[in-house]
């Protein structure tokens, strides 16, 4: 996405990938495109200020629409489909909180409404007390196909792409930077944009951690015959911490994710567990039991596959986008949090504008030293 936006700005760029394109976290993504931010709008306003929080939510809301435009532009066959989304609670003490949250979102132009158990319980087979049902601002996508189509489109537009190319050394400068590959080739650039997700944490080992790490789990079911008890097969998320999310696929399967485990030690068991680790299996089975309980009218919910991955989160649920004082000549586009794909799009847009000399003031919202 960053290379795409640089190309759109008329900037000459080279894309370098240590592994294979569309592997690693892209292949493991559940690919929920949703404007939702973990803290919710009201809590985020109390942390970063009313204007910044509103802008952050609207950025995500608009990014879903912008992603659909990119899909059309590159003619991608990636199953992009708009979906409504439902954030709910089963806690009766949170009725007023959810009502206020819904009003705050409506006030900035988000098309949502408050669902209560009295008005809409018959549209869902699981119990809830109250929830915010958003009619727009969410979608599902095939991330691997989208990435492949995006790369192919940009290569045709002149972007150079090198995969299986590991950068092992660098000399960053505000004037010109040099990157050195494992094969001892050099790349000279006016600006370097680091978009390496979890791997980018290596750049900040000397700092006090500004993030938290966890391992998140997901189960993909085999196709089911229907989505009874599931209004519009919307994207569903509860208000727990960690939360559980559920989405359909276009092949009538279900993806359920959550049951996150915190990582306190990078050398510990949770940080390095394999796919068949007993604790991982426990989390998968818990997710499967949960989706069966929530949708008793959907018969024969069976596992097709499961997977887990590392998840990087931030204190306010927002990404880190922009410059860092320790690395002149570089920008970071780090979509940490629950909206990795949308945050990456937002970062790509803002950074490309900044490099092109347009100085977008919105970068202030996502800067490194904001807390």
Map each language-model feature to its residues.
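Glycine-rich FAD pyrophosphate-binding loop
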Residues: 7-28
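Glycine-rich phosphate/pyrophosphate-binding beta-alpha loops
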Residues: 27-30, 138, 237, 241-243, ...
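Central beta-strand plus flanking loop segment that forms part of the substrate or channel wall
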Residues: 30-33, 38, 83-88, 208-232, ...
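Dinucleotide-binding Rossmann-like beta1-alpha1 core, especially the glycine-rich loop
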Residues: 36-117
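Short beta-strand to alpha-helix junction loop
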Residues: 58-61, 88-97, 133-153, 162, ...
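Helical element adjacent to the flavin cofactor pocket in flavoenzyme catalytic cores
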Residues: 96-97, 103-108, 128-191, 195
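Flavin-dependent oxidoreductases
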Residues: 169-255
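C-terminal catalytic lobe of FAD-dependent flavoproteins
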Residues: 285-371
């Amino acid at each position: 996405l960053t290379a795409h936006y640089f190309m759109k700005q008329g900037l000459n760029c080279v894309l370098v990938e240590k592994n294979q394109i569309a592997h690693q976290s892209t292949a493991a993504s559940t690919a929920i495109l949703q404007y939702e931010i973990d803290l919710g709008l009201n809590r985020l306003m109390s942390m970063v200020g009313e204007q910044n929080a509103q802008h952050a939510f609207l950025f995500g809301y608009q990014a879903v629409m912008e992603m659909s435009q990119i899909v059309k532009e590159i003619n991608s066959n990636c199953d992009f489909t708009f979906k409504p989304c439902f954030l709910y609670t089963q806690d009766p003490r949170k009725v007023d909180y959810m009502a206020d949250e819904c009003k705050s979102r409506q006030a900035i132009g988000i098309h949502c409404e408050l669902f209560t158990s009295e008005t809409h319980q018959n549209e869902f087979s699981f119990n809830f007390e109250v929830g915010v049902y958003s009619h727009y601002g969410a979608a599902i996508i095939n991330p691997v196909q989208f990435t492949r189509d995006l790369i192919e489109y940009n290569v045709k537009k002149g972007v150079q792409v090198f995969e299986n190319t590991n950068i092992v050394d660098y000399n960053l400068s505000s004037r010109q930077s040099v990157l050195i590959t494992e094969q001892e080739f050099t790349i000279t650039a006016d600006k370097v944009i680091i978009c390496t997700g979890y791997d980018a944490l290596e750049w900040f080992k000397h700092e006090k951690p500004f993030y938290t790490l966890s391992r998140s789990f997901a189960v993909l079911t085999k196709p089911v015959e229907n989505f009874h008890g599931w209004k519009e097969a919307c994207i569903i998320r509860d208000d727990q911490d960690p939360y559980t999310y559920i989405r359909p696929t276009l092949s009538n399967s279900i993806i359920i994710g959550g049951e996150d485990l915190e990582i306190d030690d990078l050398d510990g068991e949770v940080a390095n567990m394999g796919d068949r680790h007993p604790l991982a299996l426990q989390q998968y089975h818990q997710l499967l039991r949960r989706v069966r309980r929530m949708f008793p009218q959907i018969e024969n919910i069976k596992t097709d596959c499961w997977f887990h991955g590392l998840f990087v989160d931030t204190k306010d649920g927002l990404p880190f986008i922009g410059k860092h004082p320790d690395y002149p000549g570089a920008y970071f586009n780090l979509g940490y949090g629950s909206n990795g794909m949308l945050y990456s799009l937002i970062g790509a847009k803002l950074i490309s504008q900044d490099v092109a000399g347009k100085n977008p003031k919105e970068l202030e919202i996502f800067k490194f030293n904001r807390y």
